[in-house]
């Protein structure tokens, strides 16, 4: 008995000594990601011609009512800069944990292939000067970096992938993100982590992004809004619902700061019990909630759906923090998610694979018909060919693939499946256990290469990948794509910078692209 007691004492002593910071609590998200008068979340995007325009957005707290940007052609002596000043468009933004102002400026009438210096602020408090370079007006060679889903543990595990990619391609023209940049569409802390990963790089290398399913708000009975004691809305999610007793509902709750609680509600809607977790989440004491309704004018919590109309909507963060082209799209919800940009002989097209896929077909046909660029690259989140066991985007493939084939699109960049797969010429005798249509994933008479990739730590299992030339599981990746007049070189690297896959596409007159395997 004494020996067992001494063992326990020794074990707990060692445990306490091993964790000297065990009493330290997590720094609150609302403080870690709070806006200040100083600009943060500075991002370059394009909403027009990359050779003559450049858009920049940034965030401050609401005390900054007027945002300003200064711009000059860069020179070797910073003190000799004579910048022009531009007033930003400023909009109020309320997230789940804070209020902010977003500011946006589009610099216009710029000179092609020119290095500019700019900074943003309020006239007193300025950022450092950033550089950006406008696109050339000709088909000069360039490189860009492509990322699949970042999504989870973005600050912890995705940041290193982005930074390794930047080490390999510091002169990249832009970064391209194929959706699911974050996990919870409207969680400000997750968007804050996404900005922290690239940090200042987003302010000097522009961003192209297409939305994933996690950027979209969907109708869900589990995602709800309450009002806390201070009158502020709080987002919560119902983790479980136990109604073994038909007159009493036991509801387990988790908010977006990962705080949990349990509440008991009568079938009539009256609260009959609440634990300490509910007190922490709502700010109400238990006795303030007991016998109060959860619905109606006197309800302290006022439970309601986050998305009562059931219409899928892109994240509230998407449009204030990015400024993508607003083009003649067939549905208002597709603004800045369905768009195209031309960059030095390449047409880049973002399709929105989350909503209204059918009505995008006519828009896409027109964009492809009017395309006089030498190369065409399309990005959308959900892949036409999925290596994951429970996924097959048949309807999307039926709608979009005929157009990709007709116009011989060169490259399709996707995410969603948390794996790596890349199509190419394969031995058809080895193709098995795949859905109908996967046999034509790569057709040398068409030449389109489809890539699925993942940059974050969340991973899925490959169960039907025999259609692909190259596959990968449990590997965080980034891709560097080099484009010149007649060649497209594609390289995929692991998070540690090791070459994982490589191929070359060669343009041929009046023939499909020639695909040359050059990788390990």
Protein language model annotation of sequence segments:
Residues 279-280, 295-299:
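Sensory helix hotspots in PAS and closely related PAS-like folds
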Residues 355, 371-412, 430-434:
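Active-site-proximal segments of metal-dependent phosphoesterases and phosphodiesterases across multiple
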Residues 146-148, 174-180, 207-213, 351-352, ...:
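Active-site neighborhood of phospho(di)ester-bond hydrolases with catalytic His/Asp-centered motifs
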Residues 105, 272-273:
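PAS-family sensory domains
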Residues 278-289:
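PAS/PAS-like sensory domain cap-loop motif
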Residues 6-10, 14-146, 167-168, 225-228, ...:
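Acidic, histidine-bearing metal-coordination/catalytic regions of metal-dependent phosphoesterases
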Residues 104-107, 115-132, 192-232, 290, ...:
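Extended active-site neighborhood of metal-dependent phosphoesterases/phosphodiesterases
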Residues 269-272, 278:
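Conserved hydrophobic beta-strand signature of PAS-family and PAS-like sensory domains
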């Amino acid at each position: 008995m004494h020996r067992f007691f001494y063992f326990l004492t020794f074990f707990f002593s060692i445990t306490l000594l091993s964790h000297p910071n065990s009493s330290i609590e997590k720094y609150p998200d609302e403080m870690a990601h709070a806006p200040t008068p100083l600009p943060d979340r500075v991002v370059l995007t394009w909403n027009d011609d990359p050779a003559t325009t450049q858009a920049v957005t940034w965030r401050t707290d609401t005390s900054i009512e007027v945002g300003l940007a200064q711009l000059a052609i860069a020179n070797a002596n910073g003190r000799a800069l004579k910048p022009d000043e531009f007033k930003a468009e400023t909009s109020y933004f309320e997230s789940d944990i804070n209020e902010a102002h977003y500011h946006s400026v589009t610099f216009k009438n710029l000179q092609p292939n020119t290095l500019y210096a700019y900074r943003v602020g309020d006239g007193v408090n300025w950022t450092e000067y950033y550089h950006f370079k406008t696109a050339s007006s000709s088909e000069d060679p360039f490189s860009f970096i492509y990322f699949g889903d970042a999504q989870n543990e973005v600050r912890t595990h995705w940041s290193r992938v982005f930074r390794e990619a930047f080490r390999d391609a510091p002169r990249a023209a832009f970064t391209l993100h194929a959706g699911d940049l974050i996990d919870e569409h409207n969680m400000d802390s997750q968007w804050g982590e996404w900005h922290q990963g690239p940090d200042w790089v987003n302010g000097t290398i522009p961003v192209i992004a297409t939305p994933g399913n996690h950027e979209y708000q969907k109708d869900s009975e589990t995602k709800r809004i309450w009002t806390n004691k201070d009158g502020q809305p709080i987002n919560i999610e119902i983790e479980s619902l136990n109604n073994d007793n038909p007159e009493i509902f036991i509801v387990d709750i988790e908010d977006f700061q990962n705080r949990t609680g349990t509440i008991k509600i009568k079938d009539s809607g009256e609260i009959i019990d609440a634990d300490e977790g509910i007190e922490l989440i709502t700010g109400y004491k238990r006795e303030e909630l007991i016998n109060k309704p959860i619905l109606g004018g006197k309800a302290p919590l006022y439970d309601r759906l986050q998305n009562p109309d059931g219409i899928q909507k892109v994240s509230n963060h998407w449009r204030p923090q990015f400024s993508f082209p607003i083009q003649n799209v067939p549905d208002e919800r597709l603004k800045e998610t369905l768009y195209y940009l031309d960059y030095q002989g390449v047409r880049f097209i973002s399709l929105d694979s989350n909503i209204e896929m059918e009505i995008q077909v006519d828009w896409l046909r027109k964009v492809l018909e009017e395309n006089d660029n030498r190369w065409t690259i399309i990005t959308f989140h959900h892949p036409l060919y999925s290596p994951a066991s429970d996924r097959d985007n048949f309807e999307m493939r039926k709608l979009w693939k005929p157009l990709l084939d007709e116009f011989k699109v060169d490259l399709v960049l996707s995410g969603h499946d948390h794996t790596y797969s890349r199509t190419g010429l394969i031995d058809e005798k080895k193709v098995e256990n795949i859905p109908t249509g996967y046999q034509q994933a790569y057709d040398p008479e068409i030449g389109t290469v489809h890539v699925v990739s993942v940059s974050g730590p969340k991973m899925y299992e490959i169960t039907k990948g025999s259609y692909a030339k190259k596959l990968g599981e449990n590997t965080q990746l980034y891709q560097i794509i080099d484009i010149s007049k007649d060649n497209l070189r594609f390289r995929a690297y692991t998070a540690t910078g090791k070459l994982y896959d490589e191929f070359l596409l060669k343009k041929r007159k009046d023939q499909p692209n020639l695909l040359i395997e050059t990788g390990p």
